[in-house]
Amino acid sequence: MRLTRRSLLLGSLLLAAAPVAADPPPFNLAQWEADIRAFEEADRAHPPQPGGVLFAGSSSIRLWATLADDFPGIRVLNRGFGGSQIREVTAFVPRIVLPYKPSLIVFYCGTNDIASGSRTAAQAADDFQSFVRSVRTSLPETRIAFISAAPNPARWHLRAEMQELNRRVRDWSRTADRIDFIDVWPAMLGPGGEPKAGIYREDNLHMNAAGYAIWKQVVGDYLRDLKK
C-alpha cells in the first residue's frame, strides 16, 4: 500500500510538472490580416473623416459595392470582410472601428457563426453584445444598428436558428441604449413565405443587385427615420 501511495504521488507530481497544451483559439484571425491591412493602407491614403456611418460585418457588407451611391449625402465607409464571424469582427474593433469614430455603425454578421456550427443563436446574440461593449468602451455615444439575419436558399434549413438570433437581438434592442434593429427578413420573402427568387447570386447565398436594392430601401428607411 505504501508503494502504491508513493507511485500515485510521483505520478501526480509528474503530471503537474508536464506542460499543458493551450486550448486552440476558436477562430484564426491571421486569415483576415491581409484584409485588415488593406483597410489600413486605404485609410493612410485617404483618411476617413470622423463621425460618418460605418458599415461593418461579413460578406454581405463587403459585397455591397454600391453603398456610397445608394446613400448619397451620407459619409459611408465599408469595412466588411467576407466569411467573418461576430467574434472576429470584435477582435478587430481597435483597427477597423475605433479609428473612424463613427456616429453610427450598421452591422451585419452572425449567420456564418450559426452556419459553421460554432455558435448557437443565443451565443451569436451574446457575441453581438460583446461587440457593442467593445465599441462603447471607447465610443460611448456611437449608435449601433444590427441588420437582421437575411433569409437565403442556401441556408434555409437554418431559418429557425437565424430567426432566433433575430428575435434575441430585437428584444435586446428594445431596452438597450442606442441599439437598433433593422429587419430585412420580411422584405426578402416571396408570397409563399420562402426566399424571393431572383435576388441571389448563383451560390444562393449572397445577394445580387436586386437583393441589395431591397437592403437599400429598408436600410434607407431606417437612416431617414434617424434624421426626423
Where are these regions (language model features)?
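Generic structural signal for well-ordered alpha-helices
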Residues: 93, 128-133, 166, 170
